[in-house]
């Protein structure tokens, strides 16, 4: 697919209409089969997905209750009439609706979850980076670099190899997301 990529602080989470969608479990599960990586299946990643969110409808087996990114389901005036017509027409056509796009069944007409708190976008830069930059020991942020490999010691990621123009170097953290993240996982 040709996807717009968020080449800004916060990555694609800063440009994606505030949609909060983890991706289908089979996408994550295929990484192990295709690239031989361990620990990247949907079930193994689910605790991390839950840790990053505070879900407006409450914590559950699939949702967190005290993470930095607030996730909601559009209600009231936030339900655009065109989106409502799309969901309703899918149900009328016989498709089984799902109540939770990030729950046990991700298929069927439903409302997207949104990374929204009040009326403020909940991007990774707002929820993770800004607080870290305001802290006592702020990280160094490198822009316009491309991660090429994650470095592990004893099962823990301890660094990232990256390219910045013609310079290749090593860093300490990666924020590779679901859109294009598999290229870093397999490197």
Where are each of the predicted segments found?
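Conserved redox-cofactor binding core of oxidoreductases
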Residues: 34-157
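Conserved beta-strand-loop-beta-strand element in the redox core of flavoprotein oxidoreductases
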Residues: 149-186
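Active-site-proximal beta-strand/loop segments in catalytic clefts of secreted hydrolases
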Residues: 6, 17-18, 100-102, 143-146, ...
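A general structural signal for short secondary-structure junctions and capping/turn motifs
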Residues: 5-7, 61, 89, 131, ...
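N-terminal glycine-rich phosphate/pyrophosphate-binding loop and immediately adjacent elements
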Residues: 1-51, 161
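Hydrophobic residues in beta-strands and at strand termini
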Residues: 3, 71-73, 162, 187
